[in-house]
Amino acid sequence: MDVRPERSGWRDLALSQRHRKWGWDCPAVDLDFLFLEYDKGEPVAIIEYKHERASPQYASHPTYQAMIRLGTRANIPVFAARYKDDFSDFAIVPLNALAQEKLPDRKNMTEREWVTFLYNIRGYTPPDQLFDGAKIKI
């Protein structure tokens, strides 16, 4: 079975092509937009961001299963976040039990709600001035 070719063309193509030569049983993933949210050097969440026009993603896919297991083993909540082009909406999905403690079910949030959530998982409240003016549209 052949390994899928590099699709985007903007990653380090040489390494991507080389790794694919290592075979089907040596899978790896270039995590396109994976964020490690942290506070004072301590990880607080892993978030996989996808643009609204990106292909659908499934938590059952081996790539997601590896990411979920990584978070669970590290005792870090893992979320998927699909965002609109204008950042007016973030569809958040908790992917492991630790994430479900913070957010029991999938939820659509405004940018303000999402930013507030990110502050809250760090134990903080966002400063009021953060939402003033042009910094963050509401």
Where are these regions (language model features)?
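Acidic-basic catalytic patches of nuclease active cores, encompassing PD-(D/E)XK
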Residues: 1-27, 40, 125-127, 133-134, ...
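Intrinsic disorder/low-complexity detector
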Residues: 14, 32-34, 53, 98, ...
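Conserved catalytic cores of phosphodiester-cleaving nucleases, focusing on short active-site segments
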Residues: 31-53
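Short, hydrophobic/aromatic-rich beta-strand segments within well-structured domains
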Residues: 34, 46, 68, 77-82
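Basic, amphipathic alpha-helical patches used to engage nucleic acids or provide basic targeting signals
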Residues: 60-76
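Nucleic-acid nuclease catalytic cores
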Residues: 71-97
